[in-house]
Design a protein with these regions (language model features):
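Acidic, proline/glycine-rich low-complexity IDRs
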Residues: 1-68, 72-188
Length: 188
């Protein structure tokens, strides 16, 4: 990893706490790869915090601006396929130009990787668990903005489409959703 990527990894590891490790994930034909940091025992027993640490090298265009991002999440350590799903989302941004921004949903991401069928989609939000990762200046390049994955149900996705991002965000906050609980009931 070059210095910029190391700085991104160190920043995420410091925010997460716990024991850190980095693994590389490739797409099916090994033409693209993303490095993913996993930190265990930092947030709570039985949970692992994840962050991509090399996605910021890929363009992410929002309203004509290139907003560099990393994707983060918290999930039960026992959900072994969760890291793969997060890496798949990052590879979709890198390879296929998917937009990663607050309010955007990656449909079916968790179901496709066999993580959960109850909450198959990922809603991207500002990093509520780690506010210090909102916007981070790192050496030799543009600022990096972290987004946090919130697993959502199909009915929550439809509610978001009908009522808007702020309505679903408010609903999730009011009901104090444990966003790391991959078997939680839907709020809608």
């Amino acid at each position: 990893m070059d210095g910029r990527r190391r700085a991104v990894a160190r920043t995420a590891a410091a925010a997460f706490g716990g024991t850190a490790r980095v693994a590389r994930y490739h797409d099916a034909d090994a033409s693209h790869a993303v490095d993913l940091l996993a930190c265990s025992d930092g947030d709570a027993d039985g949970l692992t915090s994840y962050s991509t640490v090399t996605l910021h090298t890929a363009e992410n265009r929002l309203d004509g601006q290139d907003i560099r991002v990393e994707l983060a999440a918290v999930a039960p350590t026992a959900a072994e396929r969760f890291a793969n799903a997060l890496a798949t989302g990052a590879l979709n941004v890198m390879k296929d130009g998917w937009l990663a921004a607050p309010g955007v949903v990656f449909r079916g991401l968790l179901a496709a990787d066999g993580v959960t069928h109850d909450l198959p989609h990922v809603l991207w939000v500002e990093p509520v668990t780690w506010p210090q990762l909102g916007t981070v200046e790192v050496p030799d390049g543009p600022a990096v903005h972290w987004l946090q994955a919130i697993p959502i149900s199909e009915s929550e996705r439809r509610f978001l489409a009908a009522e808007g991002f702020f309505a679903i965000e408010r609903r999730l906050e009011e009901q104090r959703v444990a966003f790391w609980d991959l078997s939680r009931p839907s709020t809608v």
